[in-house]
From Swiss-Prot:
PROSITE patterns found in the cross-reference section: G_TR_2
A Pfam family per the record: GTP_EFTU_D4
GO molecular function, one term: GTP binding
Organism field: Methanocorpusculum labreanum (strain ATCC 43576 / DSM 4855 / Z)
Region (G5): 197-199
Keywords, sorted A to Z: GTP-binding, Initiation factor, Nucleotide-binding, Protein biosynthesis
Protein residues bound to GTP: 14-21, 75-79, 129-132
Official protein name in the record: Probable translation initiation factor IF-2
Domain tr-type G: 5-219
Region (G4): 129-132
UniProt function note: Function in general translation initiation by promoting the binding of the formylmethionine-tRNA to ribosomes. Seems to function along with eIF-2.
Region called G2, residue ranges: 39-43
UniProt xrefs under HAMAP family: IF_2_A (MF_00100_A)
Length: 589
């Protein structure tokens, strides 16, 4: 069985508006005539850039001797495409480009992308984009970076250096050694930064040739495949196509797939098998006027993007593995089920419910939630249903009566429930993972603050105080005295107790400078009216008194609110509970 080196699969990641799509467009739009030998060809969901085309763009760098046939770029940029494309329990992309705007530096999604790449152990190169936006930059269209750099003034060169070194510093903070590509001697120890401009083409050839060089040096063993082995791939997208019904957009990363092959694939209820009815690829650009946008092919060899038409594809989920079956039907289906079970999602007895459109996206979202210590109770692929909402609605903890939906809709029956307010479930939906998490965390923090505020309003707060000498204004009916708050927060309409725990009266009103106030904090000296006492009988001048806290409130204070109480309030609470716990150790617990 003859082996050959297949084309490495490349994914482009980065922060929104940092130039991912522009970079892909520039690479795809490189001026190579459609139809000539070594032309750039469009695949389903991907673009193949042959080595010959890269060599033409790379000038002197293009003299590199390599067995790597080119680069297969996934057309959809971003985390979503990267996480969707899973293979053998990791990312399908062999190598990635992390796009960073050289003028803006690292942003939220850049850091998120770095974490994903690190988790998946995917090698990557930094493309420092928007080189042409450096103030004073003089473009040299399609030139290598070094040639373009030499054409700049000393001031612009310095500015360029500074911006690259800001990236180097940030990467160092995150545990990566990095350097501009032309200064790197050890590519295993250093992350490569290639400054580029998608607008002018500067540095693009350098970037592509660096990718080829890294693939040649470090990835060739993993890129070995055969033209006769059974095809293995990953479903990028499930699509309805006119005249074809449900189809699968697949990235094939090993072996060969042909019309008539039996294939094993993962559906929502487990692995199933079906037969390839047709294999389709886009027509070349010169044939674009033909009404049928796809052309039928007999077979496809890895690495390639292909559209598959076959029966019974309705339940297939994006991100699932696909394998050609050759006489080992049950074994292949068992292997697919095993791969699906390898998805690493930690579930808890209580937590949020998560929905995503692909397996990889579900895994990525779950990892992000885990990193933020947000427990997950349910995690599944596909739209949110009525059944999901009913299950979530019976959860007791309000903070977990939540559905986080990444890139998935609500089914009509679920939409109707939400519209008619039949269920008390909070739904968060977004197409960007970090925004989805930010929205949930913001809501959760707001809910916690509201709950705490309500507790502070309804729970009797600890306080201790003493009657000031010379400040008895009325002895009884009610007694009116001046007091100093020694700890905690004193409020009206609370009972008061002596040092032996005996309840002796109730504070009716608190005044400061003849104005009625709602509370007095530690250190305040205020006038209070007390019902049910006579000064000199139940209580005396100079005596330390406590707010009488109901036993059930003590439990709430100690288990839910303690971290929000200041030292004086905690001291007052401990002194008051200590009175009762001398004889009843578990009082208020």
């Amino acid at each position: 069985m003859e082996e050959h080196i297949r084309t490495p699969i490349v994914c482009v990641l980065g922060h929104v508006d940092h130039g991912k799509t522009s970079l892909l467009d520039r690479i795809r739009g490189s001026k190579v005539v459609a139809g000539e030998a070594g032309a750039i060809t469009q695949h389903i969901g991907a673009t193949l850039i042959p080595f010959d085309s890269i060599a033409k763009m790379s000038g002197d760098l293009g003299r590199l001797k390599t067995s790597v046939p080119g680069l297969l770029f996934i057309d959809t940029p971003g985390h979503h495409a990267f996480t969707t494309l899973r293979a053998r329990g990791g990312a399908l992309a062999d190598i990635a480009i992390l796009v960073v705007d050289v003028n803006e530096g690292f942003k939220q999604q850049t850091i998120e992308a770095l974490q994903i790449l690190r988790t998946c152990k995917t090698p990557f190169v930094i493309a420092a984009t928007k080189l042409d936006k450096i103030p004073g930059w003089r473009p040299t269209p399609n030139a290598s970076f070094q040639k373009a750099y030499k054409n700049q003034s000393e001031r612009v060169q310095t500015e360029c250096e500074n911006r690259v070194y800001e990236l180097v510093g940030k990467l160092s903070d995150m545990g990566f050694n990095s350097e501009r590509f032309d200064r790197v001697s050890d590519f295993q120890r250093n992350l490569v930064i290639v400054p580029v401009s998608s607008m002018t083409g500067e540095g693009i050839g350098d970037l592509l040739m660096i990718m080829i060089g890294l693939a040649q040096r470090y990835l060739t063993e993993g890129l070995k495949t055969t033209t006769s082995g059974p095809g293995v791939g990953t479903v990028l997208e499930v699509k309805e196509e006119k005249g074809l019904g449900t189809t699968l957009d697949v990235i094939l990363y090993d072996g060969i797939i042909s019309v008539g092959d039996e294939i094993g694939i993962a559906g929502s209820d487990g692995a199933l098998s079906t037969k390839v009815r047709a294999l389709l690829q886009p027509r070349p650009m010169k044939e674009i006027l033909i009404e049928d946008q796809f052309m039928r092919v007999k077979s496809v060899v890895a690495a390639a993007g292909v559209k598959i038409s076959a029966p019974n594809l309705e339940s297939i989920v994006a991100g699932s593995p696909i394998r050609v079956i050759r006489g080992d039907h049950d074994e292949v289906l068992a292997k697919i089920n095993e791969e699906m079970q390898e998805i690493n999602i930690k579930l808890s007895d209580v937590g949020v419910s998560v929905r995503a459109d692909t397996i990889g996206a579900l895994e990525a979202l779950s990892n992000e939630l885990d990193a933020k210590n947000i427990p997950i109770m349910r995690a599944s692929v596909g739209p949110l249903s009525r059944r999901d909402l009913i299950d979530i609605s019976v959860i007791k903890e309000d903070l977990f009566k939540v559905a986080l939906c990444f890139n998935v809709p609500l089914l009509p029956d679920a939409e109707a429930m939400v519209r008619d307010e039949e269920v008390d479930v909070k739904i968060f939906s977004n197409r960007v993972i970090y925004k989805l998490l930010d929205d949930y965390l913001e809501w959760r923090d707001e809910m916690i603050r509201a709950k705490e505020a309500k507790q502070f309003e309804t729970v009797v707060l600890p306080a201790k105080f003493s009657i000031l000498p010379g400040c008895v204004f009325r002895m009884s009916g009610p007694a009116v005295v001046g007091v100093r708050v020694l700890g905690g927060t004193l409020r009206p309409k609370v009972s008061i107790a002596t040092r032996d725990g005996k309840i002796v009266g109730e504070i009716k009103q608190i005044k400061l400078n003849k104005e009625t106030i709602g509370e007095a904090k530690e250190g305040a000296e205020v006038a209070v009216s007390i019902d049910g006492v006579t000064i000199g009988r139940q209580i005396d001048v100079g005596e330390t008194l406590y707010v009488a806290i109901p036993e059930r409130h003590v439990k709430v204070l100690e288990t839910e609110m303690l971290s929000h109480l200041n030292a004086g309030t905690v001291e007052a609470l401990e002194e008051y509970t200590g009175i009762f716990r001398k004889t009843q150790p578990f009082w208020g617990k």
